[in-house]
Amino acid sequence: YLVLRKERREQQMKQYEEQQKMIQETKDFIERFKGTYSKTLQVQSRVKMLEKLELVEVDEEDTSALRLKFPPSPRSGNYPVIMDGVGKTYGDHVVFSNASLTIERGDKVAFVGKNGEGKSTLVKCIMKEIEHEGTLTLGHNVQIGYFAQNQASLLDENLTVFQTIDDVAKGEIRNKIRDLLGAFMFGSPEASMKKVKVLSGGERTRLAMIKLLLEPVNLLILDEPTNHLDMKTKDILKQALLDFDGTLIVVSHDRDFLDGLVSKVYEFGNKKVKEHLCGIYEFLETKKMESLQELEKK
């Protein structure tokens, strides 16, 4: 079935591309001769033909079997992140204080808590983007890959979607660029040839996510990565992160995404950072909560 489906899709793609070429040639003809009296009938008949034309449809890419593989990355030291008494204040406002934690190589951890309690602020401290109190040490050979909603604004606006990914893809994943784009909802030829400058906010976010997944890093920090992803794409991303052999920090309110992915939870609240050595469901059980959104109400 999968072979037949693949063959049918390839056939459709060929027909689609031929039809698009024919449409473009017809439009060029109409444009060139629309004011020419001797060509009036030909122009009119081609306009009508375009109006009646049934467009070739291409089956959606079946991405269910797509496994994203991170590129091999250099091994980091045993303790990628060590914090001792780390805190952050803005004037009189204390965001959090005295955070002491150790993240080991290969750990997959979640930062959870209501908005404004310092999750993204601590990420910025790790990224060395802002000053802080206390000591924060990054381990030997740590190479950070960072995703936040604003990463999308750093993309080169003059490149197409395909070029953006083609520039960073190395090794065998190069043969899967089309599948990869399809998995993140850029499957059609038009979508992959769009310039970054015309993409919506959600599309830019998804593109920035693919780009990050292709870079060889050993500490991945994702700040609300699932905001613009559908269920299928979330699953593909989650599977890739499960296969990732580096260290992972995820800031998220998405219980289902974190379930089975993280084995340590850092809870931000009351100006403190508290460590829970468990998965997300066990954490919610201890809190007598159904979802992470309930933390907002506390």
Predicted regions and their residues:
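ABC ATPase nucleotide-binding domains
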Residues: E10-K34, K39-K48, E285-K298
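ABC transporter TMD-NBD coupling linker
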Residues: Q42-S64, K108
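Residue-level detector of short coil/turn "hinge" positions at structural boundaries
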Residues: Y37, E57, F186-S188
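ABC ATP-binding cassette signature C-motif
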Residues: Y1-K14, A65-K298
